[in-house]
Amino acid sequence: MLGCASLGYMHAFGCVADVWWAMWLAGWPIGWLSLGESVCHTTYAAHTNHMRLHHLLVSLLLAMSVAASIHIQRSNTSTSVLEAAAALNDAAQVGAARQAAYQVRPMNDTHNRAPEGQAPVEALTSSVSAAPAGAQTQHGPRNVSSFAADASSDSAPSTTMSSFKQAEHKLLMIPGPIEVADDVLLSNAHPSMAHVSPDFIPVFGESIEMLRQVADAPSSQPFIIAGSGTLGWDLAAANLLEKDDDVLVLSTGYFGDSFAECIEAFGGKPKQLSAPAGSRPNLDEFASLLKEKKYKAVTITHVDTSTGILMDVPAVTNVVKSVSPDTLVILDGVCSVGSEEIHMDVWGVDFLLFASQKGIGIPPGLSLSLASPRAIQTFEKRSSPPAGFYTSWKKWLPVMKAYEGRTPAYFATPPTNLIYALHTSLKTMTQGQVSLSQRFQMHRDASKRVKKAIQDMGLEQLALPDSREDGVANGMTAVRYPKGLSAPDILPKMAQRGVVFGPGLHKDCKNEYFRIGHMGISVVDPSRGDIDTILKKLEEVLVEAGHKRT
């Protein structure tokens, strides 16, 4: 049929074929399509001698099409907006299933196997977009109604974890982005989905709810917005601060300094209390500053990714509560949520910002945050509009509340695929075989192991001695280069062995150290052997570079 349709020079047949094609795209039943196909073949055979019959047939099919359109219009007059959106989405999924049936071959098809050493692109495609069971992948589609039934499912791609494995790649052991689990990556490959689809709405709503569990914040309002972790700074400054508000910034590295820069860009007045690289600000000095001036907010970088220094958040919030209880507490948890224990409500944190690509364990692209009831009240009592459009909670609050209530709302299009991945990861974190408390303990254990191994290799942490006991992150380690060695002696050679570490980042000593990430799936799934691998490879590189333990 498709081959005949390509004969465009046959005017009569082309007209009828176009009508048939339009009927197929519109999803007409198989019986009607078979009739149209028969008409096309008949018209082609009789073209030269039966032009009058051709015109009659064209007229008949056009009349049928008009009648069907009228019927569809009448039936749609009582259809709600949501039902219409669902119908469009279902039609798109049926179309995708049809296309998959024509294009996809099974994984064991020898003609699809990539040459040895080459990434199996087609095989990967078939595993992610596999046609529903029973589809004729070689010789055309099965019954369209079966595809429609499959398309109504709200599940992720039908490929099971046992059949999907991500392509071979270098082991990513930097403090974010991190390694992503196979099931999370597969969820990210979910077919394109309308953000108002009845299938997507509960996925978004449940993801919002699970954020509260991860941060132990039952009373707080979560936000899931397209963007990087840095967007969280903008959200805090745009919604909680107003022009000339004083903010006390506790900084332990590059990201604390950058947060202060962001606050200034929004019209605030940041005062930084910084510490030398590898240490933490003095709490007595912090308390003195709070007594000297009324600050609208205090910002804390829980773990600064540039140094791996861990702030004692409960100690800081206790000082705030006793000295300046009206001051808001804003916590940057980009490099801590998921790998460090957090009790947002109990600690008295008013705004927690983080991202998708670190302890949460999904690809980059989501700015995640939670606001306490006090933070929401502060926003609602502003004397000026929020200093931003995309960042305004006035726009986002109705959206988050709607989806949590299992109804759609719209301000800006959410990244549906990433939210499917987020849902999968959060479900594993909150309902999986490894509990949240066990997850945090596994990160503590892995951190101790890495730091002990570093010491045994004759290396030192960037963290100063007074911070090494309880002031270092459990999801990363910053390591000083041994005497006589530098980045070119370590990082490229690790990459050659299939492991990626991160370079230094602190402005005062970025060339003096490198950073190892150990969080997420690399820690929670010991069967991967990621920690074993990096320690073994690092020792090999050090020996090759001529380093001797002291």
Language-model segments: residues:
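Conserved PLP-binding catalytic core of the aspartate aminotransferase-like
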Residues: 461-494
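N-terminal "arm"/small-domain region of PLP-dependent enzymes with the aminotransferase-like
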Residues: 147-198
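Active-site phosphate-binding strand-loop segment of PLP-dependent enzymes
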Residues: 279-336, 351
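PLP-dependent enzyme catalytic core of the Aspartate aminotransferase-like
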Residues: 120, 512-550
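Conserved active-site segment immediately N-terminal to the catalytic lysine
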Residues: 345-357
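PLP-dependent aminotransferase-like
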Residues: 239-296
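Active-site C-terminal subdomain of aminotransferase-like
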Residues: 179-180, 357-452
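Conserved N-terminal alpha-helix of the aminotransferase class I/II PLP-enzyme fold
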Residues: 187-235, 239, 254, 258-264
